[in-house]
């Protein structure tokens, strides 16, 4: 059997995740400190776990509606109105998915046809490009620079739009840079899009993890943008529910209807137990969100100060739970730096080029880990620089 001829070219050409590569290497290494995976180290709030247990004890284990439990969709709408000033019809404009990644997949599959172009600001989450390619779309990467605080510039977006452009992905707060887009930034982007037929996929999975003085703003709240925006969010990062696998998409009813049809065939429905647990998360856990954000904020300051004091310039992230230090002064590529650091000091980071070509010269550091782990990792990185004779301008 010639499997090479059987396998679809688009699937064969997919790059393995650069995140998982270093995570897997670290898993087999004794006394390794891995700062590679973006997963909260907090336990899911007890009230949420208890709600999941209660749903099982009451035998609520059957298929839910394909689009999700009505009660959950209603709570999602109440949450979005309360926290994000977004307004949706729970029966027609909300789809509950298996994590935010499935919501992204369903959105791209519903909108993108072969040959359509999808604009992806870069550096970016690793799944956008392969999902686009598998749908027959053409990824168009628009670099976001550190000198612009890793924000998408309207002039760069305008230059990237062609008659074939179908979708713009807006991944803010950003993974891996921690960049956020303020209201005025989003207004400039909306102005560029106003006279086009380009849809927006706004990935807001880190919306609650915002450390600036101004709250998160969704582009869908701007005049004329709700009708062209699919908002993706979920429970993994906000409520420390990564293993529960639950996300959602909200947007115009005609798009959500098509996404639900695809979801129906590909997935059927998101896990029932997770959905009952999520209802409690939305109703009762605003305080837990605030506590976790405060802890991440403290860790963020520790990591940013640590890298800057070593002489490795680190942009101050204002969202998510990642730092993106620049390692160009070491003279190594991102892959070389992360590989040597792992081999010599048993600290796992993710090379910046895993998030696109414009991530070269950087590495991603997740601070969703304990202060003890972060402090020890900073100590080992400092030793690594000294032992390799790297004069990075330590302060």
Report residues per predicted region.
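Intrinsically disordered, tyrosine-centered linear signaling motifs in cytosolic regions
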Residues: 62-63, 206
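Conserved N-terminal alpha-helix of the aminotransferase class I/II PLP-enzyme fold
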Residues: 63-98
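Conserved nucleotide-sugar phosphate-binding/catalytic loop shared by glycosyltransferases and other
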Residues: 59
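PLP-dependent class I/II
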Residues: 1-15, 22-29, 33, 37-55, ...
